[in-house]
Amino acid sequence: MPITRMRMRPWLEMQINSNQIPGLIWINKEEMIFQIPWKHAAKHGWDINKDACLFRSWAIHTGRYKAGEKEPDPKTWKANFRCAMNSLPDIEEVKDQSRNKGSSAVRVYRMLPPLTRNQRKERKSKSSRDTKSKTKRKLCGDVSPDTFSDGLSSSTLPDDHSSYTTQGYLGQDLDMERDITPALSPCVVSSSLSEWHMQMDIIPDSTTDLYNLQVSPMPSTSEAATDEDEEGKIAEDLMKLFEQSEWQPTHIDGKGYLLNEPGTQLSSVYGDFSCKEEPEIDSPRGDIGIGIQHVFTEMKNMDSIMWMDSLLGNSVRLPPSIQAIPCAP
């Protein structure tokens, strides 16, 4: 036969009214507000007979502790008492008045009016629903994707898969598709395709496709040979000038040379190399200026002959009969 014991709320009221536990007192008896000493066991000056007296009395009342049979465990006594207080529906903590730190730590609670039978049933049903939802969430969280895939792979399929398809409706489906699909002749399809191709406009990819490709004509052989003929003609003219030329003696800086007068006229072919004569200046040194000008003119003519020789190179060679003969001074 189970032993009946007093519930926690009336037992707690009896302990407060007895004034046997230090620190357990009413703060406001009309509002049913009271305080419980809640000093931590690690604090200096903590005493098991003074600070853990209420928790030990509750452990003895519930039968979890018997003096002389078990070793004292104030930490477990306090944890069990706190869980019992939080489970009471008609007692709540006044957190703004509680002090959880220091040597004078206390917790303040308020006793609510007793619940009726209907309120107790509603509260009990609500708590049971919450418990069921928590268990469902826990079960869903425990099931991992690996276990789910293993369960799918473990399911075996029958060897005969003919039962998955309904072959009796295959012919009916084909007949329905034939009735719905209109019959199109191949001539109509080909004509529509041809019209569609005719309406298409081909757009060039770039601007180069807008103009026709034009190829320039190849040069004729007569035009290509004109340059060679002109070069040959120039060489012949030069040879004629050398053959018709006459050599004349001249003196420069006391040295005698033969000067080819007609050869100095080659400037008409390659350009005018003659200097413009300056007007005569009436001065006592006029004769000296004229002599210097004549010397520079002769030197220029000699330079033009040497330039022509380097230009012609191997293409035009002087005949062996024409040679520069130095004159004795």
Curated annotation (Swiss-Prot):
Domain of life: Eukaryota
Inducing or repressing factors: Induced by IFN-gamma. Induced by influenza A virus.
Biased composition (Polar residues): 146-166
TM annotation in the entry: none
CDD domains in the cross-refs: IRF
Keyword vocabulary terms for this entry: Acetylation, Activator, Antiviral defense, Cytoplasm, DNA-binding, Immunity, Innate immunity, Isopeptide bond, Nucleus, Phosphoprotein, Repressor, Transcription, Transcription regulation, Ubl conjugation
Gene3D superfamilies: Winged helix-like DNA-binding domain superfamily/Winged helix DNA-binding domain
The name this protein goes by in its record: Interferon regulatory factor 1
Subunit structure: Monomer. Homodimer. Interacts with EP300. Interacts with MYD88. Interacts with PIAS3. Interacts with SPOP.
Subcellular location: Nucleus; Cytoplasm
Gene Ontology biological process terms, A to Z: apoptotic process; CD8-positive, alpha-beta T cell differentiation; cellular response to interferon-beta; cellular response to mechanical stimulus; defense response to virus; negative regulation of DNA-templated transcription; negative regulation of regulatory T cell differentiation; negative regulation of T-helper 2 cell differentiation
Function in brief: Transcriptional regulator which displays a remarkable functional diversity in the regulation of cellular responses. Regulates transcription of IFN and IFN-inducible genes, host response to viral and bacterial infections, regulation of many genes expressed during hematopoiesis, inflammation, immune responses and cell proliferation and differentiation, regulation of the cell cycle and induction of growth arrest and programmed cell death following DNA damage.
Family: Belongs to the IRF family.
MF-aspect GO terms: DNA binding; DNA-binding transcription activator activity, RNA polymerase II-specific; DNA-binding transcription factor activity; DNA-binding transcription factor activity, RNA polymerase II-specific; RNA polymerase II cis-regulatory region sequence-specific DNA binding; sequence-specific DNA binding; transcription cis-regulatory region binding
Claim: Transcription is one of the keywords in the record: yes
Positions where N6-acetyllysine occurs in the chain: 78
Record PTM text: Phosphorylated by CK2 and this positively regulates its activity.
GO cellular component, as recorded: chromatin; cytoplasm; nucleus
DNA-binding residues (ranges): 5-113
Sequence segments annotated as region (Disordered): 93-166
Record comment: activity regulation: Activated by MYD88.
Keyword Transferase in record: no
Gene this chain is encoded by: Irf1
Cross-link annotation Glycyl lysine isopeptide (Lys-Gly) (interchain with G-Cter in SUMO), location: 276, 300
